[in-house]
């Protein structure tokens, strides 16, 4: 029993179950030169068969092309409150295609359960009448075949990551290790040593870095070897995938 995990670039991942359910996580595909983010491995048009689009928070580099993909597919949008309001007001997406998430909530979509966990970050968006600041999320994905994947979004380090490991026992963690450009520096929420520590707290078998622009992916692999040598680091280039099996 396997889950196919494909990295599309920046924060974007495509997961496919054995039954063929395709989901996208934080689908930033078009890139953003202003933030130093290159285009991803695919265009939004490649995902007309997607069934689930998960967004952790409403930052542009995480929402990406989520709304566009929902419009050209039968996918439902699973997201925080701020992203929901943007989807309704900016993109005109029907409310019955949006599953609003807050921490603790769990929805079942066929052969995958999606549970929202609190991330240490923010989910801020300007609106016509002012602004909205909602709860940012991480996600725990539990598959019918037994695999469990933790997707961190933009979380910074916090002690509940250890609790998540004890309670939910994920097998794979996908963690940010870099950030967007701010005056020539990176707005990094989870630094390399913190990401390696988080992987250890989560108790995963495999850790995958994301959300970086320079050599942080390789540096994370080195940090993981030093701090959590029992965890396999998996460095994926945009477009690459691997199959995880229990």
Role assignments for model-derived ranges:
Residues 14-59, 64-71, 123-126, 130, ...:
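Pre-active-site segment of Zn-dependent metallo-hydrolases
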Residues 1-4, 16-23, 106-115, 142-149, ...:
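Beta-strand-turn-beta hairpins that frame and shape the catalytic cleft
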Residues 3-4, 52, 71-77, 147-149, ...:
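Short active-site oxyanion
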Residues 52, 82-85, 156-241:
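Cap/insert and terminal regions of metallo-dependent hydrolase folds
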Residues 1-22, 28-32, 37-38, 117, ...:
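Zn-dependent metallo-beta-lactamase
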Residues 41-109, 113-123:
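Active-site HxH/HxHxD metal-binding segment of metal-dependent hydrolases
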Residues 31, 116-147, 159-160, 168, ...:
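Active-site-proximal loop/helix segment associated with metal-binding centers of metalloenzymes
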Residues 4-7, 32-39, 96-100, 153-155, ...:
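Short gly/ser/thr-rich secondary-structure transition/capping motifs
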